[in-house]
Amino acid sequence: MKNFFRISFLITLFLGFHLSSNAAEKVEYLKTDWSFKGPFGKFDRAALQRGYQVYQEVCSSCHSMKYLSYRNLVEEGGPEFSVDQAKAIAASFEVKDGPNADGEMFMRPGRLSDKFVMPYENEKAAQAANGGAYPPDMTVLVKARGGGVDYIYSLLQGYEDPPVGINLDDGVYYNKYMYGNKIKMSN
């Protein structure tokens, strides 16, 4: 679980985009000397906390991290917020709970035991808000994409003007590392 959490928060350092599978296309990704690579690699707590901040301020408006709970914010190897900080973060979100004594659902402040709040009620609502695209959940993106963190880093660096003769619809951007070179998440 610790590695799962570490990887999830590393992703937030580099994401704020919509991507689809690139399995059919062979490209050379940008390489970076990651501090966490190798048998003696480790994550930088301050970087993970900044990563959470980036996720919260940028990515979470479209992307979920549905496999994490707010209690994961205090775990060793993750961003290691204090319990009080994590409780404050959780409480800043409204969570649907219930039913109450009258059989009705109600909203309450989040708790450490709650899963991260989703940006949309369901997949259809997410697609409707994003021009038909479903922003992927960020919890396991590094493991889900070929190339892992190098792919994600490359994708974030790969936005450029389309080559001559390539026309893009409104809300679609050219990215040399994206399968098909088209992405709906703006740079």
Language model features: what each stretch is:
Residues 28-30, 110, 132, 177-181:
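A short, polar/charged loop/turn motif at coil->beta-strand junctions and beta-hairpin connectors
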Residues 53-65, 117-123, 134-143, 151:
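C-type cytochrome heme c attachment motif
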Residues 73-135:
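Structured domain cores in non-transmembrane regions
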Residues 58-70, 159-163:
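A generic secondary-structure signal for well-formed alpha-helical elements
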Residues 2-9, 13-42:
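Post-cleavage N-terminal segment of exported redox proteins
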Residues 149-187:
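Extracytoplasmic/lumenal ectodomains and periplasmic regions of secretory and membrane proteins
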Residues 44-47, 134, 148, 152:
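Stable alpha-helical elements in mature extracytoplasmic
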Residues 28-53, 64-83:
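Electrostatic cytochrome c docking/interface patches
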